[in-house]
Design a protein with these regions (language model features):
Chain A
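Short cysteine clusters
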Residues: 74-80, 84, 143-149, 153, ...
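Cofactor-cradling patches in redox/metallo enzymes
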Residues: 156, 240-330, 374, 378-385, ...
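Ferredoxin-type iron-sulfur electron-transfer modules and their immediate structural context
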Residues: 1-138
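C-terminal amphipathic alpha-helical segment
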Residues: 336, 340, 346-395
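Iron-sulfur-cluster electron-transfer modules
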Residues: 61-71, 101, 105-323, 503-510
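Extracytoplasmic substrate-binding proteins
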Residues: 171, 292, 322-330, 344-360
Length: 511, 111
């Protein structure tokens, strides 16, 4: 399957020697006619696609002032050139953020600026040809919209917004990406990215109730569609399906149980993720978000809490109120919406949770900041809270914690390599190459600090790492959910773990 | 789109070899698909594939990894009820590779 070379992992993250066009062949599968049409786009490339693309570009620059400013303001200073994980992993100069932006910018200049209209060669303006469209399709699907480059740009140019606009333009001409568009369609028809029907979801949750009771002796509930519950939990559907995601879900449920919370999941809003953002489509992003509002109203909840999902939290924190607000029907004394880590950290601070950190002593943890949480949102009520909350929770439940190189964490975090709609098998090469900077930083703390596991708070990060880190000699089970660590250390009232700790279980346990 | 020929019938598959019309699936297709990946399906593989079929017929989706490992563990013993065993059988991932052979839709999303 893998007919590419895995880059060599070195001691430090270095700037590679350029290999022009080395990733020009990378392109995701094109969306089928029905995937396109379900989202309101033409089923295949329209005949007058050049005109449609330019009209769309014009429409976008009038709708988003930022887009116009980003296209105009680059001075080619070069600060961004070595900041993209895909450039560092592929050596392809078109994966330098400035070069990626220029794929769109050169067309913008040709058709929308005076200099570009009359002296195109002088200002790097180019006609919109089929070759340019192919380049767009290839290289705008080698950007995970992680926004690391924008942190280092003196003008604050956000490549993610340019990449989103490019994808919106490509959708408008009928050249969409199968992975994202098929998935958004599933959200509309089934309720989640996975295509998990309500009956299957109920079956998974029942199974988890059995498992947790077997493990702990406590009947922890995983409620579904409970009208009148206080809290609606919206979490990525991967939490119902994949490993280690599902261990995180068990953690949320145990925390809710132990704090006596009244909570529920919803079959119609059984997905926190919103790929509408990845394809730059305000309309689809809004339609996906509306399910959450509708479910909250229908169930009559007072609060909405989001599970461990990176881009969902960016949307929830930064855009949800604009997209589908106002949320005046929710209890205004809680954050709207709230992150599960804010909830859990709040309870840990109050002291409502009994923790036995020794349960996690077989591990030394590090933490991967997810791009959309780190650079597109916040937790708590102060800047940087999104960096502290996950670390606070991990340190509250684990004795051994080490941070990775600060050049690769917090606002400078590297993307996992699978974000922004690239987490698909047809893009495995770019995913494996894109994880290189994170793998390098991880290897360093593994070798020098004895780190054994890396925790994450995003379904995409968790899946991407479990699939791609093995290319660099790590194992799948070295990736854990933050709430999995909480789950392991939490000593629930009336549990077997409590009895064992307090010596009231009647067994003669030696340890 | 590509197609698989089997016993004089043509079966349409997508870019990754997944059956397009899932109602067409017949057991013989599994080995034909496995041939492409140099895999020989044994009884051990078929224990998994049969469970996938049963689960799919009831729930219209592949089972979660945890549901699958639990079911296999119950049937074949605890030592086999883990993802390590499943990855030995299906090195490209039990969720995706086994689903393909069993004629189930590919799990999509953040998995």
């Amino acid at each position: 399957m893998a007919d590419f070379e895995t880059p060599e992992i070195k001691e430090f993250i270095g700037i590679p020697a350029l290999q022009e066009g080395s990733m020009a062949h990378s392109s995701p599968f094109i969306a089928y006619t029905d995937h396109q049409e379900a989202l309101g786009y033409p089923g295949e490339l329209v005949e007058n696609w050049q005109q449609v693309a330019l009209d769309k570009m014009d429409d976008l620059r009038s709708r988003y002032r930022s887009f116009q400013v980003f296209l105009d303001s680059c001075v080619k200073c070069g600060a961004c050139t070595d900041k993209c994980h895909y450039f560092l992993g592929t050596s392809d100069p078109k994966n330098m953020p400035v070069a990626r932006q220029d794929l769109l910018r050169k067309v913008y200049r040709r058709y929308f600026t005076f200099a570009g209209k009359y002296f195109p060669k002088l200002v790097g303006a180019e006609d919109l040809t089929e070759a340019v469209l192919d380049d767009w399709y290839s290289y705008f699907h080698q950007c995970s919209q992680c926004r690391r480059c924008s942190v280092f740009c003196p003008y604050g140019i956000d490549t993610a917004e340019i990449s989103m606009a490019a994808r919106e333009i490509m959708d408008a001409v009928g050249k969409g990406q199968k992975y994202c568009n098929e998935i958004i369609g599933k959200v509309f028809t089934v309720g989640n990215n996975l295509g998990l029907p309500g009956k299957a979801l109920a079956n998974v949750l029942e199974g988890l109730e059995e498992d947790v009771e077997d493990d702990t002796g406590v009947a922890v509930k995983f409620p579904l569609d409970v009208k009148g519950a206080d809290i609606l939990l919206v979490t990525p559907s991967a939490d119902f399906f994949a490993e280690p995601h599902i261990d995180g879900l068990i953690g949320y449920a145990k925390v809710f149980h132990e704090t006596g919370a009244s909570w529920t999941l919803s079959t119609t809003a059984s997905e926190a993720g919103n790929f509408g953002m990845f394809i730059g489509s305000y309309e689809n992003m809004r339609r996906v978000s509306m399910r959450i509002r509708d479910a909250a109203k229908e169930l009559g909840v007072k609060r909405i809490i989001f599970g461990e999902c990176g881009h969902a939290w960016r949307i929830a924190y930064s855009f949800l109120n604009t997209l589908v607000g106002p949320f005046d029907f929710l209890d205004q004394s809680y954050p709207i919406p709230q992150h599960i880590l804010e909830y859990t950290w709040g309870e840990l601070e109050k002291g409502t949770l009994r923790i036995n950190k020794e349960e996690n002593d077989h591990m030394t943890l590090t933490f991967h900041d997810s791009c959309n949480v780190a650079r597109g949102s916040r937790m708590g009520d102060y800047p940087g809270g999104q960096f502290d909350y996950p670390r606070n929770v991990i340190k509250a439940v684990c004795n051994n914690y080490v941070d990775m190189d600060p050049k690769t964490t917090k606002e400078a975090t590297f993307c996992c390599g699978g974000g922004g709609g690239l987490l698909t098998d047809d893009l495995m090469e770019i995913r494996v190459k894109g994880v290189l900077p994170r793998a390098t930083a991880l290897k360093s703390v593994v070798e020098n600090e004895g780190v054994t596991h890396m925790a994450a708070i995003c379904a995409i990060c968790k899946s991407q790492f479990t699939k791609t880190l093995p290319y660099y000699g790590f194992t799948m089970d070295q990736i854990v959910s933050v709430h999995q660590l909480v789950s392991e250390a939490l000593v629930m009232k009336g549990s077997e773990q409590e009895a064992e700790l307090d010596g009231t279980d009647g067994d003669d346990t030696e340890e | 789109m590509a197609a698989i020929e089997f016993e004089g019938k043509s079966y349409e598959v997508d870019e990754e070899g997944y059956l397009v019309d899932l109602t067409q699936w017949v057991p013989g297709l599994a080995q034909i698909m496995a041939n492409d990946e140099d895999a020989v399906l044994t009884d051990a593989h078929w224990e998994v594939l049969n469970f996938l079929r049963e689960y799919y017929e009831e729930y219209q989706i592949a089972p979660a990894v945890r549901v699958l490992t639990k079911a296999i563990g119950k049937k074949l013993g605890k030592d086999k009820g883990n993802s390590k065993y499943l990855y030995e059988l299906f090195p490209y991932g039990p969720g995706k590779q086994a689903c393909k052979y069993a004629g189930l839709p590919k799990p999509t999303g953040c998995v």
